């Protein structure tokens, strides 16, 4: 009986050995959590739809730009066909019908808008308006993917800054720096190639060629200089698309490198800063003058800007709603009681 009294109240079924002195302590699953899932119900069929989206932090990998590529191909294909059929209603410098249609489609999508080839009839103007908004949607999709990549990259950077070794962090920083250098070299190559083509093929002066290239890659498109020959427009179809994407990637990687540095500096400052009595008071969420591991982690996450007090309050409200017996813990019975009662079949009503 005495031996039974000395056993722990909560026992996992295996021998638990105390960790050696000085060993790192690991957070384990809360013992009050259910060891198995409750029986499946009809509501479980929608669990896949309720699953959170995959990110870099949760193992989803880098956001795919496949959708952007498909939209780009579809836009260029439909736009070329549409403007090919409407080419009789266009005015400006003309070369060949198909090449001019593709050239005008690319200039419209990238919002360069030289003005050397413009719609002349009402039908052509309405068609151009439709493809202007469609092109902006394609560019917006690319920017949204880039923004998602930056946000998810921040999650991965925070995790690595808190858990990885110094050498691994340096390798990740160098990887971003190399991507920025590569994009910079591609940008220089795009500017140089465009300048040479405008100088040699279009017959512009070197300064005018460089001026037109800068106005093009930044999608400014003043319109006083543009591609007018058949060879120049054939080059411009691929060059304008590639150069504008390279510029966007260059600034994306520059923002990523800057964000990564700021994130690492913030994580390093939080980890190295000494915890004071004021920090303990701020971390004491329940006001019992004791700060547990969960309270401390939440305080550090708030300090890093990864979670706010509003988020914590929402989570606590959800916990209170699920805690049917008000025991302070969750069990399968609490979850079953919190589930709404399904409507009976129409035949039983």
From Swiss-Prot:
Alphabetized InterPro entries for the sequence: 2pore_dom_K_chnl, EF-hand-dom_pair, EF_Hand_1_Ca_BS, K_chnl_dom
Positions of Ca(2+) 1 binding: 284, 286, 288, 290, 295
UniProt domain EF-hand: residue ranges: 271-306, 310-345
Record flagged with keyword Transferase: no
Keywords annotated in UniProt: Calcium, Ion channel, Ion transport, Membrane, Metal-binding, Potassium, Potassium channel, Potassium transport, Repeat, Transmembrane, Transmembrane helix, Transport, Vacuole
Membrane-spanning ranges: 67-87, 123-143, 181-201, 234-254
GO biological process: intracellular potassium ion homeostasis; potassium ion transmembrane transport
Protein name: Two pore potassium channel b
Organism, scientific name: Oryza sativa subsp. japonica (Rice)
């Amino acid at each position: 009986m005495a031996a039974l009294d000395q056993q722990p109240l909560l026992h996992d079924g295996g021998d638990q050995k105390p960790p050696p002195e000085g060993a790192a302590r690991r957070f384990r699953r809360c013992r009050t959590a259910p060891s198995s899932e409750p029986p499946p119900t009809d509501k479980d069929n929608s669990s896949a739809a309720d699953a959170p989206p995959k990110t870099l932090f949760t193992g989803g990998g880098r956001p795919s730009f496949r959708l952007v590529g498909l939209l780009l191909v579809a836009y260029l294909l439909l736009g070329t066909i549409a403007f090919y059929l409407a080419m009789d209603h266009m005015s400006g410098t003309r070369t060949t019908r198909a090449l001019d249609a593709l050239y005008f489609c690319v200039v419209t999508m990238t919002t360069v808008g030289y003005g050397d080839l413009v719609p002349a009839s009402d039908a052509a103007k309405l068609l151009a308006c439709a493809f202007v908004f469609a092109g902006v949607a394609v560019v917006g999709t690319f920017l949204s993917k880039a923004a998602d990549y930056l946000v998810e990259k921040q999650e991965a950077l925070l995790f690595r800054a808190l858990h990885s070794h110094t050498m691994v962090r340096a390798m990740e920083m160098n990887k971003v720096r190399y991507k920025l250098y590569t994009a910079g070299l591609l940008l220089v190559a795009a500017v140089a190639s465009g300048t040479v083509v405008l100088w040699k093929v279009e017959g512009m002066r070197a300064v005018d060629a460089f001026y037109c290239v800068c106005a093009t890659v930044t999608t400014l498109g003043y319109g006083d200089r543009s591609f007018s020959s058949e060879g120049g427009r054939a080059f411009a179809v691929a060059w304008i698309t590639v150069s504008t994407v390279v510029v966007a990637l260059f600034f994306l990687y520059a923002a990523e490198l800057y964000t990564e540095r700021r994130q690492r500096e913030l994580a390093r400052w939080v980890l190295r800063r000494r915890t004071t009595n004021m920090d303990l008071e701020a971390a004491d969420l329940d006001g019992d003058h004791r700060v547990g591991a969960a309270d401390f982690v939440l305080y550090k996450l708030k300090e890093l800007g990864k979670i706010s007090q509003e988020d914590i309050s929402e989570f606590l409200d959800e916990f209170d709603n699920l805690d049917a017996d008000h025991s302070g813990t969750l069990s399968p019975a609490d979850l079953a009681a919190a589930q709404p009662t399904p409507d009976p079949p129409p035949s039983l009503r």
